[in-house]
């Protein structure tokens, strides 16, 4: 006997939209068919007449219970209980945040620490991207391989240190040689590489230039993280991806040039993807100074 049948709704699938029924056994969809396909009894039947039935959404980029400093205060983003509950009300059933491996910390410890934040505290399904920082030695590479084999199938890196050169603490940037080796591992084991892609030389040069000119107000951020930097860095990463065969997922794409680089690579059949943020879709740099923080 099936556990659940959903009938009467307009069902959205990867192959189209139709008036179909959905059969569920345990926690998995086991069938989608025309009305009357699943005539056997079910533990529960949901009448979705007049409704659109869609798969649960996946939030692929979230920073949950993540520390940050604002106006001199040590704060953190909302915890899993709060975020996962809100996500379910919006139809999102899976959340992915980041297990951060800082220099000197091994990957297994990073995963364990992040999992402890979520375990028993989430209403939704969850997992973590591995976020690597700085030098990636052979030990870290081996730990990444093991983590991928255990199901943590995505890794994020930065091609820039992002923050001003005066920021204390270790940097985030992964150098191109390590990126190449990581891409080979990613391709070999069927994982996905997420890249925060900017040209570090350009970013740091603009930080120094604006500092010298006493123009470090927040609305000049687009001058630091600019279109030229995104264009140069995306194409450099994509060139290495072409040599290694690695898939690439660019996070928070913000420039037309980045979109063009992704489109050109996809036209060649490369497994390249990009995501953006809603604020990039609603505002451009001309409106930054007028926006509300």
Regions found by a protein language model. Give the residues of each.
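Divalent metal-coordination and catalytic microenvironments
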Residues: 9, 22, 27, 50, ...
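Short catalytic-loop micro-motif centered on adjacent basic/acidic residues
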Residues: 96-97, 127-130, 247-252
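Histidine-rich, glycine-flanked metal-binding segment
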Residues: 1-56, 70-71
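Histidine/acidic residue-rich metal-binding segments in metalloenzymes
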Residues: 139-293
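Active-site mouth loops of central-metabolism enzymes
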Residues: 60-78, 127-140, 223-228
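Short, ordered loop/turn segments at secondary-structure junctions
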Residues: 34-35, 69, 99-101, 131, ...
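Metal-associated gating/positioning segment near the N- to mid-region
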Residues: 48-121
């Amino acid at each position: 006997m099936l556990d659940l049948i959903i009938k009467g709704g307009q069902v959205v699938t990867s192959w189209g939209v139709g008036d179909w029924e959905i059969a569920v056994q345990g926690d998995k969809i086991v069938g989608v068919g025309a009305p009357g396909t699943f005539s056997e009894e079910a533990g529960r039947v949901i009448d979705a007449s007049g409704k659109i039935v869609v798969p649960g959404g996946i939030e692929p980029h979230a920073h949950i219970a993540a520390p940050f400093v604002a106006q001199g205060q040590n704060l953190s983003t909302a915890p899993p209980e709060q975020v996962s509950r809100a996500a379910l009300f919006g139809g999102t059933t899976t959340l992915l945040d980041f297990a951060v491996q800082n220099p000197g910390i091994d990957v297994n410890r990073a995963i364990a620490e992040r999992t402890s934040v979520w375990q028993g505290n989430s209403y939704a399904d969850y997992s973590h991207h591995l976020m690597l920082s700085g030098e990636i030695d052979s030990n870290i590479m081996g730990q990444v391989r093991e983590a991928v084999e255990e199901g943590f199938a995505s890794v994020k890196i930065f091609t820039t240190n992002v923050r001003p050169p005066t920021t204390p603490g270790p940097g985030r940037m992964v150098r191109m040689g390590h990126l190449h080796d990581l891409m080979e591992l990613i391709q070999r084991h069927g994982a996905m590489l997420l890249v925060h892609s900017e040209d570090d030389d350009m970013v740091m040069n603009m930080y120094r230039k604006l500092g010298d000119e006493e123009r470090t107000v927040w609305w000049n951020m687009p001058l630091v993280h600019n279109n030229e930097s995104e264009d140069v860095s995306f194409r450099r990463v994509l060139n290495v991806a072409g040599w290694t065969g690695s898939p690439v997922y660019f996070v928070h794409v913000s420039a037309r040039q980045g979109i063009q680089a992704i489109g050109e690579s996809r036209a060649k059949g490369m497994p390249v993807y990009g995501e953006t943020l809603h604020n990039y879709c609603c505002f451009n740099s001309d409106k930054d100074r007028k926006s509300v923080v």
